[in-house]
Amino acid sequence: MTYLAFVRKERRLLTFAISFTFFSSFGQTFLLSLFVPYFLVSFELTNTSFGTLYSLATLSGALALPYLGQWIDRIPLRVYSMYVATGLLIATILMSISWHVVMLFFALIFLRLAGQGLSSHTAQATMARVYDRDRGKALSISALGYPIGEAILPSIIAFSLVYLHWRTTWGLIAALISFVFIPILWSLIKNERTKVVQDEDEEVASTRENYTAIFKDPRTFYTIPAILIPPFWVTGLFLYQVSAAGDMGWTAGIVASAFIAFAAARIAAGLFSGPLIDRFSAQKLFPLLLVPMMLGLAVAIFFTGHWTAYLYMGLVGMTLGLSSTLKSSLWAEIYGTKMIGTVQSLFASIMVFSTALSPFLMGWMLDGGFTLTHIFVIALATSLFSALLSCRLFFRF
């Protein structure tokens, strides 16, 4: 089935998934970073203290994600999705009325959990378990919400912060979720009868049994490093992009404009990979996941000039585009669709833990005298090791 025919046939559920990936932006680092200067002033925080607060909030959300994520396998999708959307609404309201650092901390926990965690999880788990033959297409289309959010929301938020208080801006975000996001979701999903994939005479395995099955499968350990490498290094490198601009000879304007290449490559890779997954399977394509990122790191290490920023960012964006489509398809192929929610929430939690640790490690290396080139070399080496390990899905060596 072509993309156009698939979209026409499944437009309601695809729009549902894209809405979740788009609105997950309000819990993503790229958007929250726009408010950091205002948080520092309003709550009298230092960069170090806010970084610690943010990492603790991220880790707290990661601890809750496996438990809350598994419920998508157990209750109707329309009910689960409303819980997640309501959680995101509560998080934005809490942020808009945060007058103490403790309130800020809890607002960050809920934003990271309901936004980055559960919103992304809901979209990807739904696509992975509802579709079989067209799973790759479904996941690649649903992932379009990420780059769309990255492309348009920062400018809108930055414009708002020029004229409005940051708390007012969060109040407007809460209104957007309440009067746009939730009604759209309900109109799309109110008649949905998607059920847990389970035979009538089969009991749902306990979460502990599911986890045991996951970690007994050797393929789990062949794939985890390659899954974690892109978000780990991208989180740290993007957080210190100002340092990257100086060390690599790139201006701040060049780095900002290079994000266009990043978003475009991410969209293209995600859409291109969907039909390939449907044709060849995610397991066969997975060993290629880190190749674009490794090429981008090699360009940044061995070449100089403004053009390297665009090529580096584009190639990294390509890996993230592939990753957003490949991961959920891979889980469905390896572990089946019956416990896809449990599997995906577990790995999402592990990923969030890794992204919480990345800023600490990156800051420690930069303070210890490492240059961005040194860090790129380490990132390339770890990416190469992870890529070779993932090849064991098909080759024995």
Annotate each predicted stretch with a short phrase.
Residues 13-37, 43-47, 65-68, 237-242, ...:
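Extracytoplasmic
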Residues 22, 102-118, 308-322:
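Hydrophobic core of transmembrane alpha-helices in multi-pass small-molecule transporters
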Residues 32-36, 218-260, 264-270:
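Extracytoplasmic gate region of multi-pass secondary transporters
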Residues 63-101:
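Conserved MFS/SLC helix-loop-helix module at the cytosolic interface between two early adjacent transmembrane helices
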Residues 64-76, 269-281, 366-367:
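Helix-to-loop junctions at the C-terminal end of transmembrane segments
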Residues 109-144, 336:
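Cytoplasmic helix-loop-helix junction between adjacent transmembrane helices
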Residues 142, 146-192:
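Helix-loop-helix hairpin linking two adjacent transmembrane segments in secondary transporters
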Residues 277-330:
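C-terminal transmembrane helical hairpin of 12-TM major facilitator-type secondary transporters
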